[in-house]
A protein has these predicted regions:
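Charged, amphipathic alpha-helical segments and their flanking helix caps
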Residues: 1-38, 51-148
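Low-complexity, acidic Ser/Thr/Pro/Gly-rich terminal tails and inter-domain linkers that flank the onset
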Residues: 42-52
Length: 148
């Protein structure tokens, strides 16, 4: 028996981007979405910052994969009341969107929003020093599951 193969990290990244775009479109939010860190940020902007994964081998033919996609959503240059309201409405609605679209990482997989964390002094460390700004952002962790 051969282990079923799923390009799960590929599907997880694509699924996160698709869910962000679909939710933003459903709520008429002008959100720039990137599948990796962008060259520049013009809020509101969302992007996949990192993917981490744990894998458990149960037998030669069975394993479990749990990738966690870390998404950063940048709201603005400072924590204003308007940016905070935008953040609250988005993360509440997006968490429900993910729950309703639990196969968002692909067939025979599950996804859930497992963590939300405000980043009130977020500085994109990959940008040149001359372009670095301090932003108000939120990190959303989307955890997938597949048993193959």
């Amino acid at each position: 028996m051969v282990l079923a193969r799923i390009p799960f990290q590929t599907q997880a990244r694509a699924g996160a981007v698709t869910m962000l775009n679909a939710y933003a479109a459903s709520e008429n939010i002008k959100l720039q979405v990137y599948r990796a860190r962008p060259r520049s940020i013009n809020p509101p902007t969302a992007f996949v910052d990192a993917i981490n994964e744990t894998m458990t081998e149960f037998t030669i033919t069975m394993r479990q994969r749990i990738p966690t996609v870390e998404v950063i959503i940048v709201w603005g240059l400072f924590d204003s009341g308007e940016a905070a309201d935008q953040r609250d409405a988005f993360v509440d609605g997006f968490a429900d969107w993910v729950a309703d679209n639990f196969h968002g990482f692909g067939t025979n997989t599950l996804v859930a929003s497992v963590s939300l964390q405000d980043l009130p002094s977020y500085i994109p460390d990959w940008m040149p020093d001359s372009e670095k700004k301090t932003y108000y952002a939120t990190q959303v962790s989307l955890e997938g599951f597949a048993a193959t």
